[in-house]
Structure formats: C-alpha cells, structure tokens
Amino acid sequence: MEDQETKRITKKPSRSIIISLKDIPPLDPSSIPSMKPMAQDHHNVGMQRFQEKTDFKFEEEDNAISSFSNIQIDPNSTRSISLEKKLAPKPDEEHTTTTKPISKDDESKTRRGSAKSVLHEMCASKRWRPPVYECCNVDGPCHLRLFTYKVMVEIRDSSGKTVLECFGDPRRKKKAAAEHAAEGALWYLEHVKTKPHQ
C-alpha cells in the first residue's frame, strides 16, 4: 500500500531551484521609487482662513520676492538685498527643466510597494500557494545578530510543480532579510521564468 502511494508522488515531475542573490546583478537605481515627499497644496491655508475672518487683505507678492523667501543669506555678506532679488531664479524655469513626462512603466514601479507584498499578489493572481518565509540562519553575537531568510514559492504550471527557494543576504533585521529574499524571488520570476527555455 505504501509503495503505491510513493509511486503516485513520484509520477509528478518535481524540480527544486535554489538561487542566491550573490549571482543576481544589482538593481538598476532608476527602478527604485524616489523618497521625495508629496507636494504640499496647503501652504496658504492659514492665510486664507485669516482673510476670511477679517477684512484685511494682503497684496500678492511677485515671483522674485516669493522665491527670495527661500534663499538663505549669509549675515557676513556685503552684497545688497536688491542684488539677491535679481539673482533669484524664476520658479517656472526650474520646473520646466527638471520635470519630464512620466511613462506608465515608471508609474507602475513607483506604486508597487514592498517586494513581499508584490510577491504575495503575484502568487495570488497565478493561483499558487502563498510564499513561505523561513529564517534559515542566525549568525553573530546576541547584540549583533545577522538573520538570513529564505522564501519558498511553489510554482504550478503545465510542466508540473517547481519549488523555488531564494536566499537573501544576512541582515540586522528580520523584516529586511525577508524583504531581500522576496526581491530575489521576484527577480527570478520576472527575468528568468518569463523567458522561454532556449
């Protein structure tokens, strides 16, 4: 009876792939979303509320004076303030030279989120089992622990079942180590698995 059960299990083709992040090329810095804060639209809210409650109205400042408020002046400087106003750049010039149209690929990369969440969403969309994270190695003394995580993804497709194991680099925090392992699994699924076998 046991022989029949083992025969059933061995009939299904099973592969195991182990990937170390040391073999993977480094990430392209342009693919990492920037950490710039969102533009603040509420810079004059206090002034508007003040004007609503009182009859006092302020005169509008021109671009040179408003941009002058952002300039730091050295107290030891002998230059006059009027000269500083003339040297202040116009805000329109700054925005036209530094902004570029954002493509759909850039928008999707900035909205993706953490590697763990993207990997989980990818597994759910393809109806695979959710990824399993496991701490496989703990090194160092108790005050300088380094955690190494691995992520296991069971890939089911027409050719059978493949178990993908990706190991991350040792990190000081468990969350960062698991995130690094998830990045390796994502890299494999996006670059290697999508290409046809040659």
Swiss-Prot record:
InterPro entries: dsRBD_dom, RLC_Component. The lineage of its organism: Eukaryota, Viridiplantae, Streptophyta, Embryophyta, Tracheophyta. It holds the Pfam family DND1_DSRM. GO terms for molecular function: RNA binding. Keywords: RNA-binding. Signal peptide: none annotated. Residues 114-191 form the DRBM domain. It comes from Arabidopsis thaliana. This is Ribonuclease 3-like protein 1. CDD domains: DSRM_DCL_plant (cd19869).
